[in-house]
């Protein structure tokens, strides 16, 4: 059976790995391929700061709560493993800051040690009157994609650099199952009026004295439009740009100045930090992520398609739960083709 995953960001590679781990032993003739025109370090995943944190408001789809939890638990289970360094995985603590009180987030019991800030802590951030502190995880996209690629290569997965023009093209090429993980570019393969780019721009700096993340929130301006500072394994990410519908991949001087001014106001010592890089990427914004099966009619044959895209700015936060769900959908396809019998549920 030939399975083609389109897309080599965190969604595509994690989905491919989930399918390999669950079905390679029962499908001896599994021919799994990854098609993409961009591989690491040129994907949107490479641009992401990598902090595990969902949106503040609860998702419309209750399954997304479970997928977020599954991802956090999966990453946390690796935190003391020999793989953690290669994955770009580490614990990180920090602050979410607000001008005034807001409800607790739905994920407060997923992270470690969630609590409200004390008055003394808020004195450190005089422009803000309310906030939270907790410990989360950082998973750096560039390292993680390299680790996933290595795991897939060990399992015999083949990678092809090519620009796919349509799902039909892949079906005609002999794919039995197509897994569409094309993120913000999914609309080029199949029209999706709900999908839009959420352009972001970030500055990477060398600032090893920054030990805590600081995320600010301004409900009036909207998500990602106020300063944030996120320390990674080697570098610190500065951001605060979100432009819906903007496809411009070129770094903007105006956006650079907005980020720099906002982050240096939040943490004045950053003025002494050396800038080591600046990047632009696109969040695949959709009212609800798309994770479902579809049958594609090509000629006289039906090709199975699993869509897994539209994760907005939280792809790294929810990726493993979505990969597990996509693998489950793949298992149902195998069962219908009488190639696999699903294990009985113990619920």
Swiss-Prot record:
<feature type="binding site">
    <location>
        <position position="164"/>
    </location>
    <ligand>
        <name>FAD</name>
    </ligand>
</feature>
<dbReference type="GO" id="GO:0042802">
    <property type="term" value="F:identical protein binding"/>
</dbReference>
<keyword id="KW-0597">Phosphoprotein</keyword>
<feature type="binding site">
    <location>
        <position position="317"/>
    </location>
    <ligand>
        <name>FAD</name>
    </ligand>
</feature>
<protein>
    <recommendedName>
        <fullName>D-amino-acid oxidase</fullName>
        <ecNumber>1.4.3.3</ecNumber>
    </recommendedName>
</protein>
<feature type="binding site">
    <location>
        <position position="163"/>
    </location>
    <ligand>
        <name>FAD</name>
    </ligand>
</feature>
<dbReference type="GO" id="GO:0006562">
    <property type="term" value="P:proline catabolic process"/>
</dbReference>
<keyword id="KW-0702">S-nitrosylation</keyword>
<feature type="binding site">
    <location>
        <position position="313"/>
    </location>
    <ligand>
        <name>D-serine</name>
    </ligand>
</feature>
<comment type="function">
    <text>Catalyzes the oxidative deamination of D-amino acids with broad substrate specificity. Required to catabolize D-amino acids synthesized endogenously, of gastrointestinal bacterial origin or obtained from the diet, and to use these as nutrients. Regulates the level of D-amino acid neurotransmitters in the brain, such as D-serine, a co-agonist of N-methyl D-aspartate (NMDA) receptors, and may modulate synaptic transmission. Catalyzes the first step of the racemization of D-DOPA to L-DOPA, for possible use in an alternative dopamine biosynthesis pathway.</text>
</comment>
<feature type="binding site">
    <location>
        <position position="283"/>
    </location>
    <ligand>
        <name>D-proline</name>
    </ligand>
</feature>
<dbReference type="Pfam" id="PF01266">
    <property type="entry name" value="DAO"/>
</dbReference>
<feature type="binding site">
    <location>
        <position position="38"/>
    </location>
    <ligand>
        <name>FAD</name>
    </ligand>
</feature>
<dbReference type="GO" id="GO:0048786">
    <property type="term" value="C:presynaptic active zone"/>
</dbReference>
<dbReference type="GO" id="GO:0005777">
    <property type="term" value="C:peroxisome"/>
</dbReference>
<feature type="region of interest" description="Active site lid that may open upon substrate/product migration in and out of the active site and close to increase the hydrophobicity of the active site, to make the hydride transfer reaction more efficient">
    <location>
        <begin position="216"/>
        <end position="228"/>
    </location>
</feature>
<dbReference type="GO" id="GO:0005782">
    <property type="term" value="C:peroxisomal matrix"/>
</dbReference>
<dbReference type="GO" id="GO:0007586">
    <property type="term" value="P:digestion"/>
</dbReference>
<feature type="binding site">
    <location>
        <position position="43"/>
    </location>
    <ligand>
        <name>FAD</name>
    </ligand>
</feature>
<dbReference type="GO" id="GO:0042416">
    <property type="term" value="P:dopamine biosynthetic process"/>
</dbReference>
<feature type="binding site">
    <location>
        <position position="11"/>
    </location>
    <ligand>
        <name>FAD</name>
    </ligand>
</feature>
<feature type="binding site">
    <location>
        <position position="313"/>
    </location>
    <ligand>
        <name>FAD</name>
    </ligand>
</feature>
<dbReference type="GO" id="GO:0003884">
    <property type="term" value="F:D-amino-acid oxidase activity"/>
</dbReference>
<keyword id="KW-0285">Flavoprotein</keyword>
<feature type="short sequence motif" description="Microbody targeting signal">
    <location>
        <begin position="345"/>
        <end position="347"/>
    </location>
</feature>
<dbReference type="GO" id="GO:0042995">
    <property type="term" value="C:cell projection"/>
</dbReference>
<feature type="binding site">
    <location>
        <position position="8"/>
    </location>
    <ligand>
        <name>FAD</name>
    </ligand>
</feature>
<keyword id="KW-0963">Cytoplasm</keyword>
<feature type="binding site">
    <location>
        <position position="283"/>
    </location>
    <ligand>
        <name>D-serine</name>
    </ligand>
</feature>
<feature type="binding site">
    <location>
        <position position="51"/>
    </location>
    <ligand>
        <name>FAD</name>
    </ligand>
</feature>
<dbReference type="GO" id="GO:0043799">
    <property type="term" value="F:glycine oxidase activity"/>
</dbReference>
<dbReference type="GO" id="GO:0006551">
    <property type="term" value="P:L-leucine metabolic process"/>
</dbReference>
<comment type="similarity">
    <text>Belongs to the DAMOX/DASOX family.</text>
</comment>
<dbReference type="GO" id="GO:0005829">
    <property type="term" value="C:cytosol"/>
</dbReference>
<feature type="binding site">
    <location>
        <position position="9"/>
    </location>
    <ligand>
        <name>FAD</name>
    </ligand>
</feature>
<dbReference type="GO" id="GO:0005741">
    <property type="term" value="C:mitochondrial outer membrane"/>
</dbReference>
<dbReference type="GO" id="GO:0070945">
    <property type="term" value="P:neutrophil-mediated killing of gram-negative bacterium"/>
</dbReference>
<feature type="binding site">
    <location>
        <position position="316"/>
    </location>
    <ligand>
        <name>FAD</name>
    </ligand>
</feature>
<keyword id="KW-0274">FAD</keyword>
<comment type="subunit">
    <text>Interacts with BSN (via coiled region); the interaction is direct and inhibits DAO enzyme activity.</text>
</comment>
<feature type="binding site">
    <location>
        <position position="312"/>
    </location>
    <ligand>
        <name>FAD</name>
    </ligand>
</feature>
<feature type="binding site">
    <location>
        <position position="228"/>
    </location>
    <ligand>
        <name>D-proline</name>
    </ligand>
</feature>
